Every structure is written in C-alpha cells, then in structure tokens.
C-alpha cells in the first residue's frame, strides 16, 4: 500500500511488474546523447530536419525527449497533440537514435494552475503560491496526480511499440531545489499527521515521549496540534523531511505505474545535487537503472583537484544506492554551464577526461544537458552540443564526436561492475538530522565530511562504495563511518555482524549521537551496543578553533596533529594505539582498537589532518588486505577498476597538464587502441589510459 493510499486516500493504479533487460547489456553500447527539446523549435522545421543528421555526425545514439513538453503535448485540457512528437520519434529512428521518452510532470502548464488552484503549493505561512518555475506543485493534489497519470498513460499507450523507444525518463530531478519540494496545504498537513499516526502506532503519548515534547511545554494533546513549520521542534521537522521524502518516492511510483500499465520498457529518473532531497535508496528500488546529473566547475585553479575528487565520490555514491543496477550520467555540460560563479570554458580534453572518469566509476553512458540550447528562458546561456541556431562546426561539437569514438570502443565495458572492498557510510537520515539539529554549527555536515575520508583511497586507486546504513556490508573488508550522526535501528547490529566475520570497522567522533527521533542515545554517545563493541566510553568532546592543534603521540598509525575535534574517551576493553600529548587531553586515547570476532572495531577519537587520515587508512588497508589494481606514488592519477565476467578494465586518468608515469605490469592491452602495454607507461597531460586484461581462468 502506497503512502498516498495509506495517508491521503488517493487511489493508485496497479503496476504490471514486468521489465525488459537493462538497456546497457541489451544494446551492448554506451549511451551517448542528451536532452532534446524539439518543442522549443517547432517554428523552425529546418532545425527539426537537421537535428538527427547532426546527431549522427556527433555520434549521438540516445536522447532524452520531452522532459518539459507538457504545454506542447496538451496545450489545453484534454487536447492532446502528439503529431509533432510522432514526427520527431520517426526522424530519430531513421538515424538509429534511441529515445528515453520523458514524462512531463516536472513542469505543469499554466492552464492547469489557473483552472485548478489546488495543484499549486502552499508556503509555510499558509499562502497559496502562484504559477512559477518548475516542480511547483502539490504532490498530494488529487487533480495533479490524475493529470500526471493521464498524460503518462497517453504517452505509454501511444509509443509502447515505437522502434525508437529505449526506455522512460520519469519526471526530472525530483525534489527540484531547496524550497521546491514542500507544500503546507491542509491536505499535506493532514497527510503528515496520518503518516505520524502510523509511525507511532496511533499512540500520541509514544510520540510525545519519543520527541521529548516536555521541553518548552510542546506536549501534544491532539494530533491536529502537530505542525511542521516550527524549526525549534527538531523531531517534528526531521519526521516532516521523512514524510516529504515518502511523498516524492510515492509520486514517482504513481508515475511509473501509469507508464508500466502499457510499456515494459526500463525506467529511470535523474538524481542530482547533494542527494538529500529524498531517500535515494528508496527511490532506486523503483528504477530499472539509475542516472545522475553532474556539473563540476573545472576552471584551471587549485580547486580543480577537489572537484575531480567529487566526480569520483558522487559516482560511487550513485552506484551505492543500488549496487547491482546499471547507471548512466544523464546530464552533463559539454562546455560551459551557466549557473557557476565563473563561466569558464572547458579546456581541450577536459570534457573527455571528465566523461571517462564517470565511466571509470561505473557509468554506462554519457549524456548532456543539452543537445541544442534554446534561444530564450532561464537556461539559454547554458552550454550545449549545438548552441542555438548557430553552425555546428565548433570545437565542442568535435570533442563530443571524438568522445563518441572512445565510447564505441568501450562496448565491452558495458554492464561491468566496480569491485570495492571498502565502504564509506553516508546516510540521508543523518543529513536531515544534522540540518534539523541545533548546535555543533562549527562542524561540517555528514556529507561535507566525506572528502577527507575518501581522499586516501582515491589517491591509491582503491575501490570505494558510498552506501547508507541499511546497506549489506558483507562484501567489504573495511567500513568507514565518518559521521552517521543518527543511528538507525539495526545499524549497530550489522556492523557487529560484519566485524565478527573479519571486517575492520572504523568509527569517528561525529557518529552515534542521536536516535531515530533526534534524541540523544540512551547512556550517551554511540549507544550501548557500539560502546561495548568499541570497548570505550565517550565522556566529552571538545571542538577546536581552526588555528588549534593538539599533539599526538608519534606512531606508525598517523602523521601530524589532531585538529577540529578531540573526543575524551575512557577505555573499557579497547587497546590504546595512540594518546594525546598536549593540553589537558594528554594521556587520553586518540585511537583505539578492540578485536571483535575475526575483525576489529577502531575508534579515531580526533579529527586529523590530511596526512593523518592518509597514514591511518594506509595502515588499515594493509591490515585488512585491501589494495588497488595498480601501484603508484602519484597523487595526480585517478585509477579505477571495472570487471566483467571475462575481463578486467583499469582506467588511469591524469588530472594534470604534466605527463605521469605508472607501472602496470605485464599482459595488458589498451582498450582504446588495441596496443599491447606492459611495465611502465606514460599517461599524457590530461589524458586517459584504459587497460584491459582477461581474467585468469576465463
């Protein structure tokens, strides 16, 4: 039973639970293309005629079509006009270009908001908002859900057998942007209260106790008193975020059901931004393949390296939402994104390098926003393969065509996996809890803590999955828990289970502060299970000024000083590996270990400098038996492995303008040229080397 059915009495049609094989192994080629918006050019038939020919020249094999086209598909209520879409689909098919056909519900036409005001959202002050922007609708509106279901079903019924149809692009960037996702109309508030009644077994006393509502006399005596617009009520706000997430996921389910009533083709929707608009793992369970939009700003500055690291870890995060399903980079910019502070052009070769970096981390396709830029609207200056109605013989067009040649040579990579022995845990419920929490404002959010812990593995080419606390950890040899502020039920048990079988689990001080309702854990931080597993008791924690350093005992385990935070813990069965050496912290444990079954729990009680994390994780990799596919001393190379049943593929990307050497050993072949490669090889400036080698015994 869906969220809608349970809490707001909206009927949801039954979905036919049939899907085709994933589009990557079925077609056995990398998807390459982009968002295509012919509805913006219906007044220019010459452009509509020329686009498929230009796409063919650029090596485009797939487009996302019709994403914001509702007004062109249904200019007036019930007046469906698909003739133009028929023509576009037919033209694309003649050039053997596949289509991810979009459902248009991310932006409703103006006539709908005018005729049915209930589809428009209400702000926290109770004011109905006018038509504007996109994602500007109420997800509990029966009218809006009916209209979305109707247009989706019309599309699916009409195009289910069209030979160009590869799959369905459901909606676009669910969650929109901050402020877009939440509606405070009475229907949404009633739905929230019903959602809470189910969560707390219709027991208001239990809710009051769980939320600690005696603070500031917030005790509720009737469910109708609960409102989510008071930021001081942290537990209420956290559950409002969860409710909103469930609404978004349920809305996606509603859209998918309408499509799959008629079409069994695979579905996706594009994730984006900072991944905390909703629970992406829940959304991923609805999708046949995942997709993501990435717009890193590469500007030729020292910050570029951090942005390239972001490309890697966000790709690992997307893959972690559904580890056994394929994913594709559904939006990227081939040139100059308009929404960055500095409108910097990509230097020659950067687009290729960035695109193949996503492929190295599991993407089975590279697509763009946008194929052709529109002449008007908010994104008219955003980069595209073809800019407006200008000639296509440009540097950007040529680079896109060149990348297409590379992707064609990488067909054997399609459907291959990214082996990882290390997991870093990031949980959206902790992110929401951090946003709702008052205090600790000097500390980075759980998401902002990821780069420091990801970096040591990234520089060594060690595969990492970024997963949430509900994941299956059984395949990992090393699990890092940097800042799971909120402990969800069962997480401690899963960590103890994998440690028993040989995994090394590393906890850090911003983990395990609050329970599922944002109240401090019983008995203090970490909770009773993890305190016992770690063999420590955290007594108090100090947060340091940016200029402060606390000396650490010289050891093999870390380099440098303690920074940012110093946790003062006492041991209760743990072995002390390092102690603090200065101030009143001197003598307290800074790093502890407790053997647990065949593995161990480690507790790093302080923040570390980059060199400190680098040394700590290098030692833990040695102990856990974790290594990358190639050994290199360079910190300017990205190395990532993918594996099919028969072949290993190792990607080596040089992030600098200086050639880099790497030792690869014997038996490799270039996946791009077929040339045999062995021993030491030079990777050119801003270049990419892709190695392939048969797996022994295959």
Predicted regions and their residues:
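N-terminal carbohydrate-binding accessory modules
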Residues: 6-62, 75, 90, 413
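Short, well-ordered coil/turn segments that N-cap beta-strands
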Residues: 28-32, 59-61, 93-99, 161-166, ...
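Polysaccharide-binding and catalytic clefts of secreted carbohydrate-active enzymes
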Residues: 125-313, 317
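Aromatic-lined substrate-binding rim segments of carbohydrate-active enzymes
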Residues: 49-57, 64-127, 254-262
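Short, acidic/polar
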Residues: 41-56, 150-154, 272-283, 347-355
């Amino acid at each position: 039973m869906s969220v809608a059915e349970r809490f707001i009495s909206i009927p949801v049609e039954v979905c036919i639970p049939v899907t085709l094989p994933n589009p990557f192994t079925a077609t056995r080629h990398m998807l390459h293309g982009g968002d295509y918006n012919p509805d913006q050019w219906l007044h220019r038939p010459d452009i509509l005629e020329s686009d498929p020919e230009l796409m063919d020249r650029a090596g485009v094999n797939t487009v996302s079509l019709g994403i914001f086209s509702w007004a062109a598909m249904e200019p007036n209520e019930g007046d469906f006009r698909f003739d133009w879409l028929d023509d576009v689909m037919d033209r694309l098919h003649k050039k053997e270009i596949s289509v991810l056909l979009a459902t248009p519900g991310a932006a409703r036409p103006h006539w709908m908001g005018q005729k049915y005001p209930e589809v428009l959202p209400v702000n926290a002050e109770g004011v109905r908002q006018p038509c504007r922007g996109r994602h500007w609708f109420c997800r509990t509106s029966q009218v809006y859900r009916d209209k979305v279901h109707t247009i989706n079903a019309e599309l699916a019924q009409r195009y289910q057998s069209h030979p160009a149809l590869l799959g369905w692009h459901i909606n676009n960037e669910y969650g929109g942007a901050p402020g877009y996702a939440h509606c405070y109309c009475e229907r949404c508030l009633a739905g929230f209260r019903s959602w809470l009644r189910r969560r707390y077994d219709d027991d208001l006393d239990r809710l009051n106790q769980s939320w600690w509502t005696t603070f500031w006399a917030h005790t509720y005596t009737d469910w109708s008193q609960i409102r989510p617009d008071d930021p001081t009520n942290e537990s209420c706000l956290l559950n409002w975020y969860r409710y909103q997430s469930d609404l978004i996921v349920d809305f996606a389910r509603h859209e998918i059901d309408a499509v799959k009533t008629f079409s069994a083709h695979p579905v996706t929707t594009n994730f984006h931004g900072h991944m905390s608009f909703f629970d992406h793992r829940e959304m991923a369970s609805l999708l046949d393949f995942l997709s993501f939009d990435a717009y890193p700003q590469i500007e030729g500055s020292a910050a570029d390296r951090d942005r390239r690291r972001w490309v890697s870890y966000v790709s690992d995060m997307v893959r972690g939402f559904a580890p056994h399903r394929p994913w594709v980079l559904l939006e990227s910019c081939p040139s100059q994104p308009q929404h960055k502070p500095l409108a910097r052009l990509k230097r020659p070769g950067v687009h290729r390098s960035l695109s193949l970096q996503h492929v190295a981390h599991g993407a089975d396709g590279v697509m763009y926003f946008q194929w052709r830029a529109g002449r008007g609207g908010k994104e008219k200056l955003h980069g595209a393969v073809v800019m407006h109605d200008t000639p296509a013989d440009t540097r950007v067009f040529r680079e896109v065509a060149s990348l297409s040649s590379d992707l064609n040579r990488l067909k054997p990579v399609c459907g291959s996996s990214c082996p990882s022995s290390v997991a870093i845990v990031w949980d959206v419920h902790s992110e929401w809890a951090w946003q709702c929490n008052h205090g600790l404002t000097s500390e980075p959010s759980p998401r902002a803590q990821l780069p420091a812990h990801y970096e040591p593995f990234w520089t060594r080419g060690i595969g990492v999955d970024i997963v949430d606390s509900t994941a299956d950890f059984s395949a990992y040899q090393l699990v890092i828990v940097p800042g799971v502020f909120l402990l969800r039920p069962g997480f401690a048990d899963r960590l103890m289970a994998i440690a028993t079988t040989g995994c090394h689990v590393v906890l850090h001080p911003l983990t395990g502060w609050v329970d599922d309702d944002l109240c401090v854990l019983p008995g203090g931080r970490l909770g009773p299970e993890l305190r016992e597993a770690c063999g420590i008791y955290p007594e108090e924690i100090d947060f340091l000024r940016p200029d402060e350093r606390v000396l650490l005992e010289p050891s093999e385990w870390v380099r440098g000083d303690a920074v940012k935070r110093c946790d003062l813990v006492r041991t209760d069965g743990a072995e002390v590996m390092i102690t603090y050496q200065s101030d009143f912290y001197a003598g307290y444990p800074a790093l502890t270990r407790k053997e647990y079954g065949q593995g161990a729990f480690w507790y790093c009680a302080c923040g570390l400098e980059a060199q400190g994390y680098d040394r700590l994780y290098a030692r833990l990799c040695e102990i856990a038996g974790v290594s990358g596919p190639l050994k290199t001393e360079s910190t300017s190379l990205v190395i990532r492995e993918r594996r099919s049943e028969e072949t290993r593929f190792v990607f080596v990307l040089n992030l600098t303008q200086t050639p880099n050497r790497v030792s690869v050993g014997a038996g490799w072949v270039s996946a791009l040229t077929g040339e045999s490669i062995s021993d030491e090889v030079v990777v050119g400036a801003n270049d990419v080397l892709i190695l392939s080698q048969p797996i022994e015994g295959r």
